């Protein structure tokens, strides 16, 4: 669940960002006002309790029928064969490619907790050369960059990914990046801000 990634960060969510644009709500730090639980139906309250303590969850609650399957997909993707480090690397890749500062900030916590190296994190954040990071990390970043930038994966690169992670691992990595690309699109649409105004991606050159 995304709650695991954003739990240490979500406590800051309800503070006001500095110099908010006029279309940004001061409580949510986004264009969407916070949904009030007591205004929901009993059925939707159950969904709210599962998803509403993360920013993507709060966005999805504007369409409750979508919120639960989105949460379930994310939860299942956390239990893949790839393990927590590769999961977090995939999430960071998606956040980087969409310049999604809020998503990056939340997943940076999870990546460090999972043991992703600082060199790998910086290679993703600043689009650095991959020669000095672990080979598996570099391969996953190449896979993600091909998907997001070229919109295709060469036969040679795909074969390398399959050799390293297996067919299932290759597919699961693509789904994880796709899931966080979906979240990034939703967060970009509502202009979700970091509560302290930090811009670790839009403030850094690719």
Predicted regions mapped to residue ranges:
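Mobile cap/lid helix-loop segments that border enzyme active or cofactor-binding sites
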Residues: 16-82, 205-206
């Amino acid at each position: 669940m995304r709650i695991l990634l954003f739990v240490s960060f979500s406590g800051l969510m309800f503070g006001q960002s500095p110099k908010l644009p006029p279309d940004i709500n001061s409580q949510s730090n986004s264009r969407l006002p916070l949904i009030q639980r007591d205004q929901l139906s009993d059925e939707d309250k159950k969904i709210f309790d599962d998803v509403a303590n993360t920013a993507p969850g709060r966005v999805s609650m504007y369409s409750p029928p979508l919120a639960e399957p989105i949460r379930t997909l994310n939860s299942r993707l956390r239990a893949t064969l790839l393990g927590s480090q590769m999961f977090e690397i995939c999430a960071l890749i998606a956040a980087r490619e969409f310049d999604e500062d809020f998503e990056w900030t939340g997943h940076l916590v999870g990546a460090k907790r999972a043991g992703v190296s600082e060199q790998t994190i910086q290679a993703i954040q600043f689009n650095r050369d991959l020669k000095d990071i672990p080979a598996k990390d570099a391969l996953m970043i190449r896979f993600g960059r091909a998907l997001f930038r070229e919109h295709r994966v060469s036969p040679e690169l795909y074969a390398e990914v399959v050799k390293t992670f297996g067919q299932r691992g290759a597919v699961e990595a693509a789904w994880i990046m796709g899931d966080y690309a979906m979240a990034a699109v939703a967060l970009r649409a509502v202009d979700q801000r970091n509560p302290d105004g930090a811009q670790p991606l839009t403030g850094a050159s690719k």
